[in-house]
From Swiss-Prot:
It is found in: Cytoplasm. FAD binds at G17, A18, G19, H20, S21, G22. The gene is mnmG. Its main location: cytoplasm. One of its GO terms (molecular function) is flavin adenine dinucleotide binding. This is tRNA uridine 5-carboxymethylaminomethyl modification enzyme MnmG. One of its GO terms (cellular component) is cytoplasm. One of its GO terms (biological process) is tRNA methylation. It comes from Trichodesmium erythraeum (strain IMS101). Its cofactor is FAD.
Amino acid sequence: MNQTFDFQDEYDIIVVGAGHSGCEAALATARLGCHTLLLTLNLDKIAWQPCNPAVGGPAKSQLTHEVDALGGEIGKMADRTYLQKRILNSSRGPAVWALRAQTDKREYATIMRNIVENQENLRVRESMVTDLVLGDNEEIIGVETYFGVAFKCKAVILTTGTFLGGVIWVGNKSMPAGRAGEFSAIGLSETLNKLGFETGRLKTGTPARVDKRSVDYTDLEAQPGDEKVRWFTFDPEVWVEREQMCCYLTRTTPETHKLIRDNLHLSPVYGGWVDAKGPRYCPSIEDKIVRFADKHSHQIFIEPEGRDIPELYIQGFSTGLPEKLQLQMLQSLPGLENCLMLRPAYAVEYDYLPATQCYPTLMTKKIEGLFCAGQINGTTGYEEAAAQGLVAGINAVKFVKNEEMIIFPREQSYIGTLIDDLCTKDLREPYRMLTSRSEYRLILRSDNADQRLTPLGREIGLIDDRRWELFESKQANINSEKSRLNSTRIKELDEVAINIVADTHTKIKGSITLADLLRRPGFHYVDLEKYNLGNLDLKLVEKEGAEIDIKYSGYLQRQQNQIDQISRQKNRRLPTNLDYLSISTLSLEAREKLSKVQPLTIGQASRIGGVNPADINALLVYLEVQYRQFQLTSANV
């Protein structure tokens, strides 16, 4: 708030919170030349994975690839510390392929701490921020900590995770904490409220951890990693294969369900002590039993937390029920009849700022120089947090240098889709990225994230010469191979063509290009290699890149045409001083929603909940009338 302060140190940018969002933000700002301070409540928990120690999965893997393509860190971290890797949805098309890595949580945190502590231009310090220092024009000029130390800066990025007003619950017992064993951040929520920000409460939770030595694996279904290891990062320097560990699958039983149903009144939510919304797509086991009452069993995955850690993560079994009941629930699962519980499950509720209070740059609308990223914006997940942290970091640097900030269009990346959803939709539950949230998922694949975003990363300054040369070489090889496949023909009487017809039971009339062979259902690049028609000099990712571009070329072009058509109108900018409440042709709900969100473009306005196509049409007509009146007035002057 506005006071006179004796600042201890001065920085360009201060990042509050050193989770996955804060680390990406701080590394980006420091690497782009800004003197940065990263403040955290606990130096030993930098980039900690308090819930599932895993990176990736549907839509989340695309986010991770995109962060890496721009020059971020989370993809490299997952590749450096993986315990197991699997491709999910491999039987379906490439638009929904998803790489998932189980990671070593202690190793992950140790390596990330080492990276941030040794990054040029970045200083890391343990402290709790309780206040924002504003200048005469209500702009950010610094922060103040709980113990009264003030630091001067030009921009602040809040990446506070679940720590703002955090309270953890086990049954009807609660304590102030951002997560188990760590106190919550106090004071900052009150500061934000005084500044006019709306805050709300959200809830999440984490399952119990059990001792791996107490589990009977005899009848559990093994879930091994993939033989062929895939990578999140596009940087081959990080591609070092490691020994993989096995995960296991068990299921809930009628006994499990009865225990939960009989004791629902003891859970924080069903008991009425917590009314904050939890994540729809990562429900507690109580929610599953209630919402899917007709299901007699639910899958439960048993996953290692590290190579040298005895703890197992019981995925799909998060709960807020009392601790003594939790052990009975665990021991009702096959294989866990004699398990030892090392840490109880708990629910955590915390403050967040609905992200409609941010521009798509992630700078807040009320305070210049204040950015928000991660769970404070209402998201859930390390990958969503990392993506926002990177964007906030990039734009904080742009702000400090007085350069135009970057907005990521939703049709160019999952990052853009994520931020556009956050800034335009009135979300009241934790937001998780899903492939279904993108209208353009055929184009927004993991394999082409570098093609879509690395040129931007280079322009921003986060992609160095070595990475850029690797990128250019890969793209040149893919384009060259596509040309070869489109121009190389085999004739129906050639020996290789006769063999292909015999094996595939599909005729070749006259001749056919290798590209058209690839377009056939069930025919892949590995089949070309089987008939010595492939290019032995190419890397796997280059072969796959060429195959996907050719096999799906028709669909890709159709989607690109849709994007081009929409973008012609949707990028039309809206006046920042537009009084939506006075536009009588808009529905009342649209007036209220548009006035609250203050969208920057027609496209953004069209995606706000409660704004329908008729409202957009009315808005376009209104703008056209205003424009003509302006021209008429100007002509008469």
